[in-house]
């Protein structure tokens, strides 16, 4: 019948209308230009080379903007005061590798001075032509963004459309909240809200492994199901009703009001959500798939909202 033959297109139509009219759509008025990676290294492809596996995609992402220098923000990496009184930050230990990687693209790095005054740090970000936010601990990163007063500055740079790259924790902070991070809360934060650049949650380094040999820790899927069970409000920008589990070697490219999956993993990502009975449902997302239409198409099917 006509209805059967056109079922997918009908669902896609309603999904696109739902995106357009709800408050969780990517805003077309904002010239977002984000590349959100799950991880920085892939030992199976480019051993020990920071961002090495992603260089072809990074080049395509940055080249149209004629970027000469990129600001590197290492808030997510822990710092300790060593015996001689100096402060040693883990982020500084990878800078040579970061510099070598971007040098291959003809781009210099400029490290954000995390010891400078808040005003000077804000000024560095305001003047950046591109930004790279490294991975580490999401709670450390979130705490620093607010304490340094740079959260609103970064939001403005996102609206300007400058290229912004995030890895792991640096990707999670573009979600509405940090509730789907894998990290321990090694510092206290006053809320879970972050940049809200994208209207859905990411789980970086996604890899569901069932418990074996007496190991009783909760699985990744069980934890993400708990998140979904406690954040089920449809249409809320602070409580997305699905999670994208990004496997290693995968990334999300956000351009304006479009979000697309990219990367080098044969099983790049999983869409995790609850059906109307509260059961966890997973669907594999393919490379080059337009995420928003696909995710809400699947969501509407499972919830029978059409």
Segments predicted by a language model, with ranges:
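C-terminal and late-domain segments of enzyme folds
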Residues: 29-65, 75-92, 180, 184-306
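Structural motif
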Residues: 36, 130-134, 165-166, 201-202
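Conserved acidic residues
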Residues: 68, 129, 199
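Flexible gly/pro-rich beta->alpha loop and the following alpha-helix that scaffold active-site loops
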Residues: 107-163
């Amino acid at each position: 019948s006509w209805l059967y033959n056109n079922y997918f297109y009908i669902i896609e139509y309603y999904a696109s209308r739902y995106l357009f009219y709800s408050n969780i759509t990517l805003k077309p008025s904002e010239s977002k230009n984000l590349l959100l990676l799950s991880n920085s290294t892939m030992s199976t492809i480019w051993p020990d080379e920071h961002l090495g596996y992603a260089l072809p995609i990074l080049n395509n992402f940055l080249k149209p903007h004629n970027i000469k220098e990129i600001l590197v923000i290492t808030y997510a990496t822990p710092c300790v005061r060593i015996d001689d009184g100096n402060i040693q930050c883990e982020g500084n230990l990878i800078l040579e590798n970061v510099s070598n990687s971007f040098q291959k693209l003809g781009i210099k790095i400029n490290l954000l001075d995390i010891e400078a005054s808040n005003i000077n740090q804000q000024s560095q970000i305001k003047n950046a032509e591109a930004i790279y936010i490294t991975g580490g601990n999401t709670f450390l990163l979130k705490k620093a963004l607010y304490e340094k007063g740079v959260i609103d500055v970064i939001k403005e740079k996102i609206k300007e459309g400058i290229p912004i790259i995030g890895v792991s924790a640096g990707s999670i902070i573009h979600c509405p909240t940090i509730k789907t991070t894998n990290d321990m809360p090694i510092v206290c934060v006053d809320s879970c809200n972050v940049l809200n650049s994208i209207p859905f949650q990411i789980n970086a380094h996604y890899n569901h492994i069932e418990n074996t040999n007496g190991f009783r820790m909760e699985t990744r899927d069980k934890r993400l199901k708990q998140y979904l069970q406690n954040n089920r409000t449809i249409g809320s920008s602070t409580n997305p009703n699905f999670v994208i589990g990004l496997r290693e070697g995968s990334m999300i490219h956000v351009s304006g009001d479009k979000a697309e999956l990219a990367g080098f993993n044969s099983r790049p990502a999983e869409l995790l959500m609850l059906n109307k009975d509260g059961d966890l449902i997973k669907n594999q997302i393919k490379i080059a798939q337009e995420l928003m239409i696909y995710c809400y198409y699947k969501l509407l099917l499972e919830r029978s909202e059409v």
